[in-house]
């Protein structure tokens, strides 16, 4: 069982053939400044990208207070009971707000044949999936790095400690990399990695 993260990459929470009942949780966050909500999408399958897996259900967690990206902490819990019924809960740790979805065995779940086919496909496209996943992760890492630098430069407590010229130079670099990211949505892993090396302060 999975949920989707930025760029359509799957985050695997429960492995195939896990003994039930079982419960797993993981912390996720926002990927835009002042993002008011997050969409939790639950998938079943073996592939690295969401588009190649089976969507079981989705729900929205709203009411996240304005904050820079990556600051809110959203705890997502997958809980499968002894009957195979899946409860997925998303909790905003800052406000205590939560929402959930229940997915029963008959709700769009894959048959054994479908699962076998997906396992075979996962093996067949393993290399391609890995390349896609690495590319998107490299892009996300570069974007996160830029936003972390930007937030640091705008932090009131640190502003006085960084010389104004350095701060302006760094901010200019960060903005140009974010513009480049916007225009190069499908660059290769190496390009994103090189860009991150060039941007390190």
UniProtKB/Swiss-Prot annotation:
Belongs to the heat shock protein 70 family. Disulfide bonds: none annotated. Transmembrane segments: none annotated. It holds the Pfam family HSP70. PANTHER family: HEAT SHOCK PROTEIN 70KDA. The lineage of its organism: Eukaryota, Sar, Alveolata, Apicomplexa, Aconoidasida. Keywords: ATP-binding, Nucleotide-binding, Stress response. This is Heat shock 70 kDa protein PPF203. The keyword Nucleotide-binding applies. One of its GO terms (molecular function) is ATP-dependent protein folding chaperone. InterPro entries: HSP70_C_sf, HSP70_peptide-bd_sf, Hsp_70_fam. It comes from the Eukaryota. It comes from Plasmodium falciparum.
């Amino acid at each position: 069982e999975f949920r989707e993260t930025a760029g359509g990459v799957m985050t695997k929470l429960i492995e195939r053939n896990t003994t039930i009942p079982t419960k797993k949780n993981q912390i996720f966050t926002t990927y835009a400044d002042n993002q008011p909500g997050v969409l939790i999408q639950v998938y079943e399958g073996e592939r690295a990208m969401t588009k190649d897996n089976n969507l079981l259900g989705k729900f929205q967690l709203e009411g996240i207070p304005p904050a820079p990206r990556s600051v809110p902490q959203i705890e997502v819990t997958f809980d499968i009971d002894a009957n195979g019924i899946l409860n997925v809960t998303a909790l905003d740790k800052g406000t205590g707000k939560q929402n959930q979805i229940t997915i029963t065995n008959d709700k769009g779940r894959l048959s054994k044949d479908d699962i076998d086919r997906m396992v075979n496909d996962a093996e067949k496209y393993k290399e391609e999936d890995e390349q896609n996943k690495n590319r998107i992760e490299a892009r996300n890492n570069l974007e996160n790095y830029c936003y972390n630098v930007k937030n640091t430069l705008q932090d009131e407590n640190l502003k006085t400690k960084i010389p104004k010229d350095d701060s302006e130079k760094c901010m200019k670099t960060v903005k140009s990399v974010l513009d480049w990211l916007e225009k190069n949505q499908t660059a290769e892993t190496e390009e994103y990695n090189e860009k991150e090396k060039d941007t390190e302060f």
